[in-house]
Amino acid sequence: MFEPITTAQAYITPDNATTEIPRVINAAIQQRRPVHIHLPIDVALTEIEISNPFKPEVEPQKNVQSYINMVQDKLESATQPVIITGHEINSFHLHKELEQFVNQTQIPVVQLSLGKGAFNEENPYYMGIFDGSIAEQDIQDYVNQSDAILNIGAKLTDSATAGFSYQFDINDVIMLNHNEFKINDTCIEAFSLPNILNGLNKYIHYKNTNDFPQYERPQAHNYELS
């Protein structure tokens, strides 16, 4: 029953505990998603021998240059690029890496409501929240008219986009998510989000010069209680 909402599951026995528990913990760390370990009550107090203490597996960095070059080509042909970011940045703690990429490319950023906190709202390239047809009109206009949309660590779900109410061409979206790289007809599931962001920072040589709406921070109000 837990399989649809977890990334790994294990039913623990005295014989498999030393392999299954590390496997599931590694899955939780690498995928940043919930896991489920079923530990029967008659097994919980069983003593077992552990030959080596647990150490998280280090996921190797893969060569993403040829795929990042496709992103470079898309940006060079674009007139109005934008970055949509979301919750995976929070899950993988990639705020610094994302901000580095934004600062060096000067591409404006919007967040999905699901990913609030994914990007520094004090950054001059931050535009605000994009949630489809209920976003601020100037943000709607800019994002919907963009011809190169870098979707970094975000999911364009119905709840995050007001029922899929965005108006941009989905073919202009480059998916740069954990285990999901998609541009045109190229789909790869082998790259982690940290791997992708490191590749963006290393191989993208592009600077945006297009104007974009400036984020206006809500003003604080002084209320008097009577």
Predicted features along the sequence, with ranges:
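Well-ordered alpha-helical segments embedded in enzymatic catalytic cores
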Residues: E20, S66-M70, D138, I196-G199
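Cofactor-pocket helix-loop regions in the catalytic cores of large enzyme subunits
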Residues: D15-N16, I25, I29, H38-P124, ...
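Short acidic-hydrophobic, aromatic-tinged amphipathic segments that line or gate anion-handling sites
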Residues: A8-N16, M127-S133, L176, C187-L200
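Structural signature of the thiamine diphosphate
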Residues: F2-N52, K74, I139-L176, Y206
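Short acidic-hydrophobic sequence patches enriched in Asp/Glu that either
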Residues: M1, A135-D138, S192
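Glycine-rich, anion-gripping cofactor-binding loops and their flanking helix/strand elements
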Residues: H87-I174
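Phosphate/pyrophosphate-binding active-site segments
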Residues: I50-S51, F168-S226
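A broad, structure-centric signal for solvent-exposed, well-ordered loop/edge residues
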Residues: Q9, A44-T46, I50, K96, ...
